[in-house]
Amino acid sequence: DLAKRKEEALAPGTDRARQRQHDRGKLLARERIDLLLDPGSFHELDLLARRPSDSGYEDRPYTDGVVCGWGTVDGRKVFVFSQDFTVFGGALGEVFAAKIHKLMDLALKVGAPIIGLNDGAGARIQEGVVSLDSYGGIFYRNVQASGVVPQISVIMGPCAGGAVYSPAMTDFVFMVEDTSYMFITVPDVVKTVTGEEVTQQELGGAIAHAAKSGVCHFTSADDASCLEDVRYLLSFLPSNNLEEPPVVPTDDPVDRLCPELRDIIPPSSNQPYDMAKVIEAVVDDGEYYEYAQRWAPNVVCAFARLGGHVVGIVGNQPMHLAGVLDIESSEKAARFVRTCDAFNIPLISFVDVPGFLPGVDQEHGGIIRHGAKLLYAFCEATVPRIQV
């Protein structure tokens, strides 16, 4: 009987629901976990969890719509939950949330990253206020884990209503282009209230949040490449705030010269140049991973390595607005600096900035307040800081 239950729990949705997921270009919850983690490393928690028999609900599938457990990425332990859109549309209910609460508590005790693969329809309205209350437990744990263990949210389908706030409180947000979206209110409600007609992708798609709102830090073409990108990001991060980031052996000499900088940086301060090329010339093997590349492009934030050690780089980008600091770039850089400081990543600043952007919109939008965030972040940081 136990073997039969486990077999049922491993494929709780219908064949039709699973096929529809694939037809939309999306992977199933367990397929995503298999791609994210090292082969054979996944250990599942609460496989047979479901609604209690006296709950009054006839539909009581195992897992309750979310797959939870731990495994390894490049041999390092991580905790992961993957919402299953084939069960209740991935909507959050009481048991669903309890599994995530347990997972987050364990990750915090162990000191390992938390990765959420989001693909769900928000709160399970059939369960009423109980499901809404369950969000509070997730939000609370997001805050308790902030700056203690890395938290990564991967949006791989719908994420609407209250469900959007947990990813917003995590350290990094990935989105899959064309198949994922985040918004508080759906387009139909927006049209009813404001009269604005907008599609799901225009309102809350990956490109919209990567380029306009700044909610999304990394975008990918499909599920598989997105999960590979998550693995790559983890290679720059420690497991928790008491550890150092991974050191990677390199053949790039630490004492090499960079004569190409003479050609990249023009003699006149009035001529623009690409700061990304400067970073590429300096870091190990020319390899770096840019943070929030599409948003506030007048400042470049990136993870890279020098001598095999991870560093966080903040550089003004003369190719965009002459590298001037405005509201969005100040907020972007401040968040990046504070994240690096939390996880013991030294900071290097490549400075070429004419100052803060003047203008009525900037002043009324709070450039003083937002600019102060960047100053605060640098002054607060206790990691080594180098200005170039």
Question: At which residue positions do the language-model features occur?
Answer:
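Ligand-binding clefts of soluble mixed alpha/beta catalytic domains
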Residues: 1-388
